[in-house]
Amino acid sequence: MADWFSSPLKTCTHVCDFPSLAGDPQQEIMCCDSMKNKLQDSRKVLLVSCSVSFNGSFYGGNRNVRGQLQISMVEDDGVCRPIGYVPIGGYLYHNDYGYYEGTRTFNLDLESQYLKKDEDYNRKFLVSILNENGLDSQCDLKVFIVHSIRIKV
């Protein structure tokens, strides 16, 4: 991995908005290097990490909400597997709005095969909300995801 340190760093950023957390919502995102036809030679891509931050709110009184923000990745064999979880939730005594927020970085270090100059690097991810207790239509969440990528010619 040391030979990657001098390679240029690029990021791929996504925002997933969940206005309601009823029914275990999920969104699909695509990490892409957008380097198709920009270089003269073939290249390799190193997917270094996936950084996740979120904030959200819930409403109610005497309410305990709890769940997990799950990030999954479609691997080379076509199977979607979790790369990590971030807990979400909180508790309210009074009828009011409660807020939750969090952040986590998942180190991936996934190296691609050589890509031709006329193709993009693509990796599909799935952002899911897992309800463990009380996440419903009175809960919302906005998720920000940044993939760090290194490119080596």
From Swiss-Prot:
Q: Where in the cell is it found?
A: Host nucleus; Host cytoplasm
Q: Which domain of life is it from?
A: Viruses
The answer, when asked if ATP-binding is one of the entry's keywords, is no
The record's GO CC annotations read: host cell cytoplasm; host cell nucleus
InterPro entries to which the protein is assigned, alphabetical:
Nanovirus_C8
- The main location is host cell
- A Pfam family in this protein? Nanovirus_C8
Q: Does the keyword Secreted apply?
A: no
- What does the UniProt keyword field contain? Host cytoplasm, Host nucleus
Family the entry assigns:
Belongs to the nanoviridae nuclear shuttle protein family.
Described by its record, this protein's role is as follows: Putative nuclear shuttle protein.
Q: What is this protein called?
A: Putative nuclear shuttle protein
Q: Which organism is it from?
A: Faba bean necrotic yellows virus (isolate Syrian SV292-88)
User: What is the gene name?
Assistant: DNA-N
